[in-house]
Amino acid sequence: MSSKEQKTPDGQAPEEIVTEQHEEVESVESAESAEQVDPRDEEIARLQSELTQAQNRERDTVLRMKAEMENLRRRTEQDIEKAHKFALEKFINELLPVIDSLDRALEVANKENQDMAAMVEGIELTLKSMLDVVRKFGVEVIADTNVPLDPNVHQAIAMVESEDVAPNHVLAVMQKGYTLNGRTIRAAMVTVAKAKA
């Protein structure tokens, strides 16, 4: 018998047996490798997950810090702006009694007396100059009558019945008020109209 004609006891050629055994070994190895995951792969996956979480935490921290720095910068700018805007408040408060005194001097001065005319004119010019200067720095006078009572700028000291002025409107200003850049530094003392009973 030649080698090609040799048969195994099962009746299969030796090449067929080797091929079948090789296929069985490969299928067993692939089944085992599918069941057994390399522990290094698990460690790599765990480390990648931890790295991703750490990156996300760091990104959040950086974003929070940027937002906090932006808020701090904005608050600082606002504080500086307010400091510049209202730096004159103390000075203006000290100047108000002087302006009030000039106003009162004009009210009581006898304007018909020719001997006093020059003095009255001097007081008027001084008061006008002083008011012009303080207006340049954001000071506004609150002295309007027949306007609605505004508790932000008016302090009502009396209520008087009136037919000429609408109820809850300023009837008379007893003492002028002042604002500095929109902030009330002294409320105007006013008499308020009320409806006749």
From Swiss-Prot:
Keyword set, alphabetical order: Chaperone, Cytoplasm, Stress response
Residues spanning the signal sequence: none
GO molecular function: adenyl-nucleotide exchange factor activity; protein homodimerization activity; protein-folding chaperone binding; unfolded protein binding
Region: Disordered, residue numbers: 1-43
Pfam family, one: GrpE
GO cellular component: cytosol
PROSITE patterns: GRPE (PS01071)
InterPro entries for this protein: GrpE (IPR000740), GrpE_coiled_coil (IPR013805), GrpE_head (IPR009012)
Localization per Swiss-Prot or TrEMBL: Cytoplasm
One GO term (biological process): protein folding
Residue stretches spanning the membrane: none
Family affiliation: Belongs to the GrpE family.
Assembly and interaction partners: Homodimer.
Task of the protein: Participates actively in the response to hyperosmotic and heat shock by preventing the aggregation of stress-denatured proteins, in association with DnaK and GrpE. It is the nucleotide exchange factor for DnaK and may function as a thermosensor. Unfolded proteins bind initially to DnaJ; upon interaction with the DnaJ-bound protein, DnaK hydrolyzes its bound ATP, resulting in the formation of a stable complex. GrpE releases ADP from DnaK; ATP binding to DnaK triggers the release of the substrate protein, thus completing the reaction cycle.
Protein name: Protein GrpE
Organism the protein comes from: Cronobacter sakazakii (strain ATCC BAA-894)
Gene name as annotated: grpE
